[in-house]
Amino acid sequence: MVSAFLHPFAKPTRTDFRSIVSGRGSIVTDSEGREYIDAMASLWYCAVGHGRREIADSLANQASTLAGYSTFDPFTNEVVEELAERLVAISPMADARVFFCSSGSEAVDTAMKLARLAHVQAGHPERTVIISRQRGYHGTAYGGTSVQGIPPNREGYGPLVGDVVQVPADDIEALATAMSHHGDTIAAVLVEPVQGAGGVFPPTEGYLEGVRRLCDQHGAFLIYDEVISGFGRLGHWFAAHRFGVRPDLVTFAKAVTSGYVPLGGVFVGPSVRSALEADPSFFLRTGFTYSGHPLACRAALANIDIIEREGLVERAHHIGRRLSAGLHSLAADDLVAEVRGDGAVWAVAQKPGVDPMAIRDRMLDMGVITRAVGADTNTFCPPLVITDAELDRVVDALTQAITTA
């Protein structure tokens, strides 16, 4: 019999879910007492690991003082102001501001709206086109569904948001052609610097630089979706730092709190904020009930403290080198078709005839969590506190799952 809970990204008729009841570090435990190495940081987000007492204590203290309150005009709170300042200090854009929401999906939809709105405020209401890329994942709200480049996730929902153009990933000539065609109707180009749920695809050499040049040439904003890549995953605070290419808007979520409380946001760079701030009578009419929620902001502050104190941004390099070496050893032994990744997020493409979902399930039975995405890919995005021994067990389990297929 199905439960009352309708699961996301699952068959509505499925009944045999594994119930996770606790977590500590990189290990989670299910209701049957089985332990798993969480090689996906839950869903790309638990950077500091599970069961961090400092975050739990900070939440309890905050809840006893101010658990929640609106930040709509005329209100604010000390925690959201402190977090905004903290985030701007590590932002890839100088003189940015921060808009808060509760998820990456909300962040993407907000970035799309702000890009279009900034053009309206600058006197260019014709600039409405958003260009996105194939394989891109940008959440499942209506805006994100409309721009994402994973076709099955777009199907069945009727008409989506208009004025969206999609181009092949990493094909700078295709992007140049699309931008020439749409010209001064383009609002923004939206990219994941490293595509995540689409299969973990880092950018090709020079691609992001080319996108920036084209945006400047055509007067379009560049939006980075850093919901997965932000907060140390690539060995830098943000992918914009990693690749040295400046965007105009950056979305974030996931590892900003390591998932202890949902939080998302958008860095609003100078080119966008200047358009929004130019008219003192302009009133920004977008936001969410929980924008700047004190508990979420407190969780983020405690989480960032841990990342800084424990050097987890730097540790991502070590994790990436060790995980990459292990996965490439499988490729050298002709066990996988391809290895892709950057920093501490990696994937393997299975050889023809190997089902990544079956690999996922076999690894679960061996006590290791991976994800299966697309037709051939298994992904790995472990907590940044994972030990070397745990990383080696991940690779060993993957090897065993493939060789016993």
Task: Spell out what each predicted region is.
Residues 1-405:
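Conserved N-terminal phosphate-binding loop of PLP-dependent enzymes in the Aspartate aminotransferase
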